From Swiss-Prot:
Gene of this entry: gag
Region annotation (Disordered) ranges: 298-407, 419-451
Principal location listed in the UniProt entry: virion
Extent of Basic and acidic residues compositional bias: 313-324, 352-364, 398-407
Compartments it resides in: Virion
Name of the molecule in the record: Retrovirus-related Gag polyprotein from transposon gypsy
Transmembrane segments: none
Keywords: Transposable element, Virion
Coiled coil start-end: none
Biased composition, class Polar residues, residue ranges: 332-344
Length: 451
């Protein structure tokens, strides 16, 4: 097919109108077009060839770009110098006769022992470093060797077993390196400082909160001492202490913070002193308020009591007006009634033949010899009326009879018997139904009168 006489109708839709316009695209093919318009039908093979050509061009362009980037990365990698970690080898200390040192070993002997407690390691490490610095310039001398040996012998317990298991040589730096690897804090400094800034008092007492801040600060300072040189450690420690002071004030309760923050303390002990003074003043004010409130309530209740009883005459004062020699005492009616009911006499059930019988003269002159030398037990020491009341309670409780009726009945029978048996009546015509008179017998046939 010749492309010289082929045309294609392309309809272009404009945004403003719905009309269509035919556009000739033959010039895009690089062929001159005639005025005649014909329809074009393309073969699928030709369409596939066009698509393959476009894909190949795009892939070649991307491949060239990727190749350029790979070449630049390769050049950068070649320019980098990767340094492998260097392993430091420690040698055992030895004695050189040419090196002399006359410094005494007292400071080395004063270093405390270390038994493997992690909380004590940083303090022991600092004291050991301070003591060893005096002998460090005399490496090879006998004093230097003795100093390192003494420090090694100060390490005992789990820490000493650790050095033995790793076959650590007799070298101060080697000993510290091995102990640092085991007992140093592996937490990052950033996390430790973040934990210090997040401390809050909450419901903790003031001193407990201060101790918590000190613990967090100690962890941070120990980490700085372990990972930095002396000069850098001093600068970082000063910065961390300022952060700890700010965290302590910010974490206080609102009432304490309102007092401590305007004072601008310069260190933690000063801030603690201000906080304790503020806490004491708050407690005093709270106590004063509660005490004043209690006094006010007491005064108010006293005034109400006076107004309640005001205007009522006093019976005792009225009695004094009538006769000053006779006054009525206030009585507790409830308690008196209870005592009266408890002490009310109860009649005793005794045999009618032995009722109100006096002891004979023979018994008065010759008491029972069998009981003369016997010791009276607790039951015999009790008084007659009380003993009879107990017996009455035991006997009459199951019957549930009225005490008044029983008393009247017993009294009537006793009077009738006295009238019929005058020979048994006492000479003074006295009657006692409680068994307290001479000649009266109880239920257990024991005399309760005078001996």
């Amino acid at each position: 097919m010749s492309w010289a006489h082929n045309y294609r109708k392309v309809k272009v839709e404009y945004e403003s109108e719905d009309s269509w316009e035919e556009e000739q695209v033959g010039q895009a093919l690089g062929r001159p077009l005639d005025s005649a318009t014909v329809d074009i039908t393309m073969d699928p093979n030709q369409i596939q060839a066009l698509i393959d050509n476009a894909v190949r061009q795009a892939l070649s362009q991307q491949q060239s770009q990727f190749q350029t980037q790979l070449n630049s990365l390769a050049a950068r990698v070649q320019s980098l110098q990767v340094e492998a970690p260097q392993i430091k080898i420690y040698e055992k200390v030895s004695v050189n006769p040419d090196v002399r040192c006359d410094i005494p070993l007292d400071i080395i002997k004063s270093v405390p022992e270390f038994s493997g407690t992690q909380d004590e390691y940083v303090a022991w490490r600092q004291s050991a470093i301070y003591a060893y610095e005096l002998f460090k310039p005399y490496n090879g001398s006998s004093a230097h060797y003795q100093a390192v040996a003494i420090l090694r012998n100060k390490i005992r317990g789990a820490a000493g077993a650790l050095l033995v298991s790793h076959n650590t040589v007799l070298n101060f730096d080697a000993i510290l390196a091995r102990l640092d690897c085991t007992y140093s804090d592996k937490t990052s400094l950033r996390l430790l400082r973040q934990g210090l800034e997040m401390v809050r008092q909450g419901d903790l007492p003031l001193m407990q909160y201060y101790d918590e801040v000190e613990k967090k600060l100690t962890l941070v300072t120990n980490k700085i001492v372990m990972t930095h040189e002396q000069e850098g450690a001093d600068l970082l420690n000063a910065e961390v202490r300022a952060d700890a002071l700010h965290a302590f004030i910010s974490g206080l309760k609102k009432a304490l913070r309102a007092v401590v923050f305007p004072a601008q303390p310069k260190d933690l002990p000063s801030a603690l002193a201000l906080a304790r003074e503020a806490e004491a003043s708050i407690e005093r004010s709270m106590f004063a308020n509660s005490y004043a409130k209690a006094v006010e309530e007491r005064a108010h209740s006293g005034a109400n009591g006076k107004s309640r009883f005001q205007g009522k005459p006093n019976k005792e004062e009225q009695g004094q007006d009538r006769n000053p020699h006779f006054t009525k005492r206030p009585k507790n009616n409830g308690q008196t009634n209870k005592d009266t009911q408890a002490q009310a006499p109860q009649p005793m059930e005794v045999d009618s033949s032995s009722r109100f019988r006096q002891r004979t003269e023979h018994y008065q002159n010759h008491p029972n010899e069998s009981n003369a030398f016997k010791r009276r037990n607790s039951s015999e020491r009790s008084t007659g009326p009380r003993r009879q009341r107990l017996n009455n309670v035991v006997q009459e409780a199951p019957k549930q009879k009225d005490p008044k009726e029983e008393y009247e009945k017993t009294a009537k029978a006793a009077v009738e018997e006295i009238d019929s048996e005058n020979e048994y009546a006492p000479s003074d015509d006295s009657l006692n139904f409680l068994g307290g008179a001479p000649g009266c017998r109880s239920l257990n046939d024991g005399w309760l009168g005078e001996p």
